[in-house]
């Protein structure tokens, strides 16, 4: 979400497991881990059943391949595998190559991106025009304590809340005159 709210992961998983027992039906927990990537949060280690992520972002790292990842528990593996097979979901060899290429530098890139994101977030917090920076690793974030309990780092994506509401014209003017940043697809890729 653009608000980057992180719940108490342990409480959420336990609540879902309790509900599953009460209703007598197994509830499968699926977690989109695109923001934190595979380095900063491991959903399966926190009791989730299936992890999905857009590998186009951090894994590939160059916005030059469309790739998604699914990791799952042994319990859900057969169903996930069959779903992918029956829907014809698979990646081509060149796309896999680009993903493997990106893995070589992913840790270095994500570490640098996290450090840079923290620096930018701290700078944004000091700007008069900004009411709030929505980035869980910030101590000022309402999600900070939950982030700190479960995550070991953070993604490079954040949002801001402005003090004033601006017109579409004013926002377009601001975006059109940016020199360091630009609007882009795939989290600012090409």
Regions found by a protein language model. Name each.
Residues 1-129, 134:
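Conserved PLP-enzyme active-site core in the AAT-like
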